[in-house]
Amino acid sequence: IGGDGASYDIGYGGLDHVIASGKDVNILVLDTEVYSNTGGQSSKSSPTASIAKFTAAGKHGKKKDLAAIAMSYGHVYVAYVSHGASQAQLLKAMREAESYHGPSIVIAYSPCINHGLKRGMGKAQEQAKLAVECGYWTLLRYDPRLAQEGKNPLQVDSCLLYTSPS
């Protein structure tokens, strides 16, 4: 378990080495999109134009796409989850990651105090849900086992949660 600072920036080299190795390891990244423990500075996990310490005019670069990098190896289980949006999808992703014999990385959208939530951290679950509902954070699962069965390994879960029946 690690934060986005350790996964996208400072410890990225080690993380990349581990997922490239093919070893059976499970990784959970709590993605706050800023360096939370040191006061909310911008990081490689911060989205374009986001305002944080050291990027008062907005971040110029793109957010590093850790999921796409992991998926590019072809042998890494990858999931984007949001604890407030769907606990069922979160549990499904965690179970799939655990059962996968190889590296897995689950990236969890994690609101933090540095986001300046107007109603406080007591509403973090609600904020995590809103991030998915508005399309900011996509819930997805990439399971290489499906590709071996001739199926699409990428499953987007967000649209399934918020599509109304006709």
Task: Report the location of each language-model feature.
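Conserved small/polar residues in nucleotide/adenosyl-binding loops
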Residues: Y162-S166
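DG-centered beta-turn motif at the end of beta-strands
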Residues: I1-Y8
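Glycine-rich ThDP/TPP pyrophosphate-binding loop and its adjacent helix/strand module
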Residues: D9-N26, L30-S158
